[in-house]
Amino acid sequence: MMVKVASITKLEDGSIVTPKGFSAIGTAIGLKKGKKDLGAIVCDTPASCAAVYTTNQIQAAPLQVTKDSIATEGKLQAIIVNSGNANACTGMKGLQDAYEMRALGAEHFGVKENYVAVASTGVIGVPLPMEIIRKGIVTLIPAKEENEAHSFSEAILTTDLITKETCYEMIIDGKKVTIAGVAKGSGMIHPNMATMLSFITTDAHIEHDVLQTALSQITNHTFNQITVDGDTSTNDMVIAMASGLSETKPIDMEHADWETFVFALQKVCEDLAKKIAQDGEGATKLIEVNVLGAQTNEEAKKIAKQIVGSSLVKTAIHGEDPNWGRIISSIGQSEVAINPNTIDITLQSIVVLKNSEPQMFSEEEMKMRLQEHEIMIDVYLHLGEETGSAWGCDLSYEYVKINACYRT
């Protein structure tokens, strides 16, 4: 998609409250010791919304409630999120608790119940401590200040080491339109959606069905192309809210600036996806895999994700070992039809394989480049014109330690 980069500007100090109409808050209520664990995003008016959910067949209670809310009118005005407890596999009581969270939020913020989404993340199979939740929700006072947006980003974290935020400005109908996002995710990342939550705000004027189409397509190229450990979760989703307060004409696929909006949405999702991959549990390196010259985009993405999801590739990268044999082995495991004689592989811009034949390279130079925190693997199939990318991280000793002691 060709879009003038000049029409998109990254706002380094922007946040989810930068788009017109949004406020946020994050606070500590006692679900996690000494850390923020409850947050909310609120819109001044009912906002068009869209969502993409985990494909795990076991879906947590908050996800079911959010689906119910969005299906009613395709609008949201508030999102309430807790961390420290997933409210997953908690039976009928868990579903009742999630609906109560929605009702409490609606009453507190003065909005319709079906305008409230709820999300939870944390330990599975533990009942939600509703007495703490009830007392906590009534203390939420969202604000339009950037520091409150940052407090929300902290409140949704679990094993994450860093908050994940991004914001862009674009020109639609000659007017400034902003779009921002926040996410959490560190372990159990292998979406079609998995163990990650992301919330996107924009003041673009766009209807529910159009926004849903754009979000679904972009999620497939961004969030669904990250993997940390190959496990999918029960709770996770991406929700986008559009206040419409930029006062442009309605944006749809026929709008002259449609591609600009889609590009900005993709940049937000891609930024957050990379931040999640980079913050994988125990991770020390971000791995980006680009597959070029494939017959279809889907095949390119499948190969890229196969490579970045390989435990052997991950451990080689962690050990700063240029073992490209693990990369080509992963390509062969992808179940995509390839020509085994025409494959090129570059690692950190150094050619290690050409037409499927090993190439001489400086081990010393390679070792130095593999010490960097961002690792790039490029694969050229020479079969077609399509490309695809995926993101992940290395696999370290610390990952095992974190997950062996998660409940303790």
Swiss-Prot record:
Signal peptide start and end residues: none
Residue sites binding substrate per the record: 158, 184, 195, 281, 403, 408
Pathway where this protein functions: Amino-acid biosynthesis; L-arginine biosynthesis; L-ornithine and N-acetyl-L-glutamate from L-glutamate and N(2)-acetyl-L-ornithine (cyclic): step 1/1; Amino-acid biosynthesis; L-arginine biosynthesis; N(2)-acetyl-L-ornithine from L-glutamate: step 1/4
EC number: 2.3.1.35, 2.3.1.1
Site, Cleavage: residue positions: 194-195
Keywords: Acyltransferase, Amino-acid biosynthesis, Arginine biosynthesis, Autocatalytic cleavage, Cytoplasm, Multifunctional enzyme, Transferase
Record field: catalytic activity: N(2)-acetyl-L-ornithine + L-glutamate = N-acetyl-L-glutamate + L-ornithine; L-glutamate + acetyl-CoA = N-acetyl-L-glutamate + CoA + H(+)
One Gene Ontology biological process: ornithine biosynthetic process
Site, Involved in the stabilization of negative charge on the oxyanion by the formation of the oxyanion hole: residue positions: 121-122
Subcellular localization, as worded in the UniProt entry: Cytoplasm
GO cellular component: cytoplasm
Coiled-coil region: none
Name of one Pfam family that matches: ArgJ
GO MF: glutamate N-acetyltransferase activity; L-glutamate N-acetyltransferase activity
Residues the record marks as active site: 195 (nucleophile)
Key word Glycosyltransferase present: no
Chain's role: Catalyzes two activities which are involved in the cyclic version of arginine biosynthesis: the synthesis of N-acetylglutamate from glutamate and acetyl-CoA as the acetyl donor, and of ornithine by transacetylation between N(2)-acetylornithine and glutamate.
Family to which this protein belongs: Belongs to the ArgJ family.
HAMAP family reported for this sequence: ArgJ
Subunit structure of this chain's protein: Heterotetramer of two alpha and two beta chains.
UniProt protein name: Arginine biosynthesis bifunctional protein ArgJ
Origin species: Bacillus cereus (strain ZK / E33L)
